[in-house]
Amino acid sequence: DGVTDLYGVMWKPFDFDSTKHYPIISSVYPGPFYEYVPTQFDFIHGRNTQLAQLGFIVIAVGHRGGSPMRGKYYHTYGFGNLRDYPLADDKYAIEQLADCYPYIDATRVGIFGHSGGGFMATAAICTYPDFYKAAVSAAGNHDNYIYNKWFTETHNGATEEKKVVKDSVNGDR
C-alpha cells in the first residue's frame, strides 16, 4: 500500500558471493493470527537454512493481515478474503528486495508453505504465474469454508449462501 512497513528475514548460502545471481524462495504462512517471521533460530524455520545451503536466497516476510500485535488495521486487513490478502505483499517484498540487492534473480522466484502456507503458495502461482516459477504446497487448506469453521468465520466472516449439493442417491438438495 506504500505506507505499511513489512518486516522479514533473509537466509543466504554459507558460501554466499554477492557477485553471483541467486534464485529466491519465499517461505510463507499467511496467518492471520501469526507473523511468519522468526525472531530466533528454531526447528520450524530449519528448512529455510537447508534451502539456502542448496544455493537459494530464502525469505520469510510478514504481510498485512498478519500479527494482531501490529494494530487493528494491519491485523484485520485480510478479513473477508483469506485467499488474496498476503499475495501482493509477498510479491512486492520480493520485487523490492531484488531492486535493492543485485544478487537476487527476480526471474527465478519460488514459493512454498505448509497448511495455510500451502494454500498461499498455490494461490500465488495461480494468481501471478508469470512471476512465481515454482510452488510447493504441503497440506494446503484450499477451501477455507470446509477447512475449519470456527477459524474461517472468525477471520473471514460467516456466509449464508445456499449451495447446491450433488447427491447421487437423492438428487440435488
Give a label for each model feature.
Residues 42-44:
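Charged helix-capping and loop-helix junction motifs
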